[in-house]
């Protein structure tokens, strides 16, 4: 930012650092303007990062403008390719998988089909040593007690409550209300209150202990089920999860979100069969089979877990096939921007 500091700058730098360290990137090129407040050199120092063959930086002003910048950028990326291309696939444990849990365009079926099915998949992942990140704090509001009672220790539960209180104050000073979250699409899909929405949303987290609560874009170091404080807006929320280390996004939708993510593939889970028939090209799994009576939550959870393993092994998700996600880097903008 040109004139941004404090919390907003801290969050931006943390987010950029998380992407720079992300395992789904073979190499990273960081390009700055040259006179911005978030200087590349100070960002590197603050983040504990060092330039190397697979982390290159430069700025536009020192490079002589747009054309020279593009030419230099292409040359630097090409120089990374030989080392990046040496990487070979090899068998590894599911413990290396970190899923970012998302829901967007929720409906009245979300809490009884796709969300609990995703929760069942989360339980399987956690049993294999993996990690799942629940986020979208405003959509936990009113159901936080279901999470605090699962906290591994008192401090974890208290940190979640502190983040809820922060959101109450944050929305108040900005003229909003925490209890008025459902969107027009949510209401058209049968959700009328934040409590209905939140009770369904927390089902994505399965049944295991809540092991840690993180602030936005903080590195997730704890294995198991954790929570990261983010807004409910999907691109901002997922950006924080990816910065924290999520290498796959599992996204439930009842109304038909076509969201995609990069560098972490997004697996789309339809809550109802009508949506599946309408947008099959965007959806990866039809959790509406639970509502139809042709599959159980546990069976669908196993199917989701199997797809997570397949996508982690290189099978492209529907949103990847469409090329979605290249424009979905949206850090949370906090504080004054002058």
Feature names for model-found ranges:
Residues 1-248, 252, 257-338:
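Metallocofactor- and cofactor-centric catalytic cores in central/energy metabolism, strongly enriched
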């Amino acid at each position: 930012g040109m004139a941004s500091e404090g919390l907003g700058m801290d969050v931006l730098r943390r987010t950029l650092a998380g992407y720079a360290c992300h395992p789904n990137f073979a190499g990273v090129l960081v390009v700055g303007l040259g006179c911005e407040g978030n200087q590349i050199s100070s960002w590197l120092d603050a983040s504990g990062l060092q330039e190397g063959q697979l982390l290159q930086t430069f700025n536009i002003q020192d490079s002589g403008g747009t054309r020279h910048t593009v030419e230099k950028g292409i040359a630097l990326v090409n120089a990374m390719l030989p080392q990046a291309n040496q990487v070979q696939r090899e068998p590894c444990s599911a413990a290396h998988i970190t899923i970012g849990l998302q829901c967007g365009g929720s409906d009245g079926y979300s809490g009884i089909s796709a969300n609990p099915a995703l929760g069942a998949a989360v339980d399987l992942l956690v049993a294999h040593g993996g990690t799942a990140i629940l986020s979208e704090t405003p959509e936990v509001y009113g159901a936080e007690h279901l999470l605090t009672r699962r906290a591994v220790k008192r401090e974890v539960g208290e940190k979640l409550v502190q983040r809820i209180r922060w959101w109450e104050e944050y929305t108040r000073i900005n003229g909003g209300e925490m209890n008025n979250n459902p969107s027009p699409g949510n209401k058209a899909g049968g959700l009328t209150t934040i409590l209905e929405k939140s009770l369904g949303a927390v089902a994505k987290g399965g049944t295991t202990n809540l092991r840690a609560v993180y602030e936005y874009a903080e590195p997730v170091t704890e294995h198991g089920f954790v929570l990261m404080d983010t807004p409910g807006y999907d691109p901002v929320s997922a950006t924080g999860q990816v910065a924290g280390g999520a290498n796959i996004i599992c996204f439930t939708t009842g109304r038909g979100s076509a969201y995609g993510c990069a560098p972490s593939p997004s697996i789309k889970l339809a809550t109802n069969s009508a949506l599946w028939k309408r947008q099959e090209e965007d959806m990866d799994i039809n959790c509406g089979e639970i509502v139809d009576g042709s599959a159980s939550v546990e069976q669908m959870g196993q199917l989701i877990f199997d797809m997570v393993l397949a996508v982690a092994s290189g099978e492209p998700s529907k949103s990847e096939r469409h090329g979605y996600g290249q424009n979905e880097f949206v850090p949370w903008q906090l504080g004054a921007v002058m």
